Regions:
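Active-site signature of alpha/beta-hydrolase-fold catalytic machinery across serine-
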Residues: 72-73, 77, 233, 673, ...
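Intrinsically disordered, low-complexity terminal tails and inter-domain linkers enriched
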Residues: 5-19, 81-104, 241-248, 639-655, ...
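C-terminal accessory region of SF2 helicases/translocases
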Residues: 338, 364-373, 379-586
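PRPP-dependent phosphoribosyltransferase catalytic core
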Residues: 746-768
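Helicase motor core with emphasis on the C-terminal RecA-like subdomain
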Residues: 18, 22, 26-31, 41, ...
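Acidic, metal-coordinating catalytic cores used for nucleic-acid/nucleotide bond scission
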Residues: 297-298, 321, 663-670
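Mobile, glycine- and charge-enriched loop segments
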Residues: 722-734, 739, 767
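Active-site-facing substrate-recognition patch
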Residues: 262, 552-658, 668, 672-676, ...
Length: 768
């Protein structure tokens, strides 16, 4: 928000600035709490375009440049009436609200993250700007906030893009806000573009919002991470559909991406243990506090646990972290109460700690743009910050998985549109997301993302109670989706080139080039990265530290929580008996997996095993882990009383008396080998195999579809009378190779319990 880590007065300003600029400078000084700062010329150019020209502007500037200063200063000027001031007239009084009126209501800021909102509200209030938020957490306060807006008591209103898709907000509140807004700000505007690294479907509605604004309503879009293609796309969306507004009238202020405080480096290490040992030593020695980024939730949780065991004050921060806990963790890092947060990309845009001293990536993001955005958290207010990438062998497979979650193929989209069209014709009312899961194989998050895109495209509409068809024709833009996919792959390849750079190449020069920095000189080198000699990284951790890390990662075992509720709408899939809560007498007990496929430690061995379609046996090195987790499951079964399937009235569970294997079409020899090994090790009788009819179903489908697949496939039809007799009252260990949705285990356990088993506890090699 300030003009730099150590901003000096801008001597390039005119010797006799206009009264508007003088007032803007005074607002900036209050905003940053210093008397020796001045607006940069490009900051002033954007403010002038917004306030005096009432134009639309896109500001693409690096983190720390002062983008929020532009819209907060512009807000004060608009609210005080400077937009209508002309030379020769009296100047508005500082702090007045003479500009408040039908055309000079509050600034509406669309901001993607609660963390970003919190920081922005705090910054605004320090400058005497009245700022409030409207989000899902304070819906009860919306009427009071609306009244404050109506009476002119609110200068800045922050809303999340998700609010734009809320029917009540979209239809009742948003039109009134848009009609009276003095300024509209789209923060983190790269999210508008589906070419961008962080495209969000909710942002697509912003284009519709902007098109409906009254003429000459100023609009500012800001981002720190946009290459030339994304910049052009966002600029087009800012101006391309506004009545009477030509694209050329969108002011684009784009600056250098150079960050001279950042010292970039890459260290390639042979395996997860070597990386963890190196990271532990680095975090222990690093000055100040920082962020350790991971690609998955499992990795973040596991690494945080290992670092804490090494005596380091760290905490995990992921998309699964409770909102209140996130706020506390952010404050802990800002005040240096923790050495580091071990985070996924959930800690990203908007987090502001000027003295953040380091950022380490345990695994590479899938694009240079995304990487630059994350490392930009460091070094904003200090002369030196270190940024280290520790690539992992699993990075590419993780990228591919996230990439597979893009816009669905046309048949999946058409299935949803057809279902909504039929519901509308038959007068059946809107369909909930739960019901739509029964007409498509898409998983919930992908389905919801697709519906948001269709909503913005005008094909469907979100209403109270679900979704309905608009009846408008809709075309599947296969060519565009193919281009986006090709761009994604190209960015992954660029990230791999970044990892492989060698001297005399320069890491910051590579990132600036990848982001199409408009002012980077030819043959420029930063002088600060490891290839330029500005950062010297320890080559490897000590051998004993690596062995300690290896021992730590060798710990295995993941608790599997059983499914407790059938998905809604199973009657639409021909399975009406599967509804509501799963009866305790038909529910699996708590189970165990040897490990997660997206974690560290045994994850690599498990991935290699599960990816073999005809794997015959567990590798020798993994067998002790399998038996160790089996013993943990036995202990868990002894402790697991009322919360297991079967005899819900007992206090303690008996030890396992039998082993049942779920038939695998892809790895039949593997699961049978595991079943035999557990039967011997646990002294539990081999009771039989849950059969699987037909071809194995897909795992990359929605919850209801996956349940329907396994419910129609799994069977005990081949069990003999003798086998069923042996099942009566048995405490069963149910063996499968891996689990994802949990429905295979739930259905198999239900079959066994209904056939007479007393308890069923799942055991799998891997959890995905």
């Amino acid at each position: 928000m300030t003009a730099g880590p150590d901003p000096a007065p801008d001597t390039s300003a005119a010797s006799s600035p206009s009264p508007v600029r003088e007032r803007a400078e005074s607002v900036l000084r209050v905003l940053v709490g210093r008397d020796d700062v001045a607006l940069r010329e490009d900051q002033w150019r954007a403010i002038e375009a917004l306030v005096i020209g009432r134009r639309r502007a896109l500001v693409v500037q690096r983190t720390g440049w002062g983008k929020s200063a532009v819209y907060f200063v512009a807000t004060v000027l608009v609210r005080e009436g400077w937009a209508s001031w002309r030379p020769g007239r009296p100047t508005p009084a500082p702090g007045s609200r003479s500009g408040v009126g039908p055309r000079s209501g509050p600034t509406v800021i669309i901001s993607p993250l609660l963390a970003l909102m919190r920081d922005q509200v705090a910054a605004a209030r320090r400058a005497g700007i009245s700022a409030v938020t409207m989000n899902s957490a304070n819906a009860a306060q919306w009427p009071a906030i609306e009244e404050q807006v109506r009476t002119g008591d609110v200068d800045v209103l922050l809303v999340s893009p998700e609010r734009l898709n809320n029917p009540t907000f979209r239809d009742e509140i948003l039109p009134r806000l848009a009609a009276g807004a003095g300024l509209v700000v789209v923060d983190e505007a790269h999210c508008i573009s589906d070419w961008g690294h962080d495209f969000r479907p909710d942002y697509r509605r912003i284009r519709t919002l902007l098109a409906g604004l009254p003429p000459r309503t100023p609009v500012l879009a800001t981002t720190a991470t946009a290459n030339a293609r994304v910049t052009a796309d966002v600029a087009e969306q800012l101006g391309g559909t506004a009545p009477g507004l030509r694209d050329a009238e969108v002011l684009v202020v784009r600056g250098t991406l150079e960050r001279d405080s950042l010292h970039l480096g890459v260290r390639r290490l042979p395996d997860a243990a070597a990386r963890l040992a190196w990271l532990t030593d680095y975090v222990r020695r690093a000055p100040g506090s920082g962020i350790v980024y991971c690609l998955t939730v499992s990795a973040a949780q596991e690494i945080a646990e290992r670092l804490r065991e090494a005596g380091l004050e760290v905490a995990p921060y992921t998309g699964r972290t409770d909102a209140a806990d996130r706020e506390q963790l952010e404050e802990d890092l800002k005040t240096n109460r923790v050495r580091a947060l071990v985070a996924t990309s959930a800690l990203g845009m908007g987090f502001d700690k000027p003295d953040l001293a380091f950022v380490v990536h345990m695994g590479a993001p899938d694009s240079p743009v995304s990487y630059y955005q994350q490392v930009g958290r460091a070094g904003r207010g200090v002369d030196r910050a270190e940024v280290v990438l520790l690539p992992g062998a699993e990075d590419r497979s993780i990228w591919d998985w996230f990439g597979s979650q893009g816009f669905p193929p046309e048949p999946e989209v058409r299935a949803v549109l057809t279902a909504l069209d039929e519901a509308t014709r038959e007068g059946g009312g809107p369909l909930s997301t739960n019901l739509l899961e029964t007409v498509t194989s898409l998983r919930r998050t992908r389905l919801e993302s697709m519906l948001k895109v269709l909503d913005v495209d005008g094909a469907v509409r979100r209403v109270q109670g679900g979704w309905e068809s608009t009846g408008r024709p809709w075309a599947y833009d296969a060519e565009r989706y193919a281009r986006v996919e090709a761009a994604r792959i190209a960015e992954q390849e660029a990230m791999e080139r970044y990892e492989a750079l060698e001297a005399p190449e320069c890491r910051m020069a590579f990132l600036r080039s990848a982001l199409d920095d408009p002012v980077m000189p030819a043959h420029w080198r930063c002088g600060s990265c490891d290839l330029c000699g500005g950062l010297v990284l320890k080559r490897a951790a000590r051998a004993d530290d690596v062995e300690a890390a290896r021992a730590s990662l060798a710990r295995v075992g993941v608790v599997l929580t059983p499914r407790r509720q059938w998905p809604a709408g199973m009657d639409r899939l021909g399975l009406p008996a599967l509804r509501g809560r799963i009866a305790a007498s038909e529910r699996a007990g708590t189970g165990m997996a040897v490990g997660r496929m997206d974690g560290l430690g045994v994850a690599a061995a498990l991935r290699g095993l599960i990816e073999q379609d005809d794997a015959a046996e567990v590798p020798l090195g993994l067998r002790p882990s399998v038996l160790q987790v089996a013993e943990r499951l036995t202990a868990l079964m002894a402790e697991d009383g009322d919360d297991t399937g079967g005899d819900a009235g007992s206090d303690d569970g008996p030890p396992p008396s039998g082993v049942v294997v779920i038939e695998s079409r892809r790895r039949p020899r593997l699961v049978r080998q595991v079943g035999r090994a557990l039967s011997r090790h646990l002294s539990a009788a081999p009771l039989g195999v849950v059969g699987a009819a037909g071809e194995p179903g897909r795992h990359d489908v929605g919850s209801a579809f996956r349940l329907a697949q396994v419910a129609r496939s799994l069977t005990l039809a081949d069990w003999s009378h003798e086998a069923l007799t042996g099942l009566q009252g048995a405490s069963v260990v149910l063996v499968d190779d891996w689990t994802d949705s949990g429905w295979t285990l739930a259905v198999a356990a239900r079959l066994l319990l209904r056939a007479g088993a007393a308890r069923v506890h799942p055991f799998v090699l891997a959890q995905r």
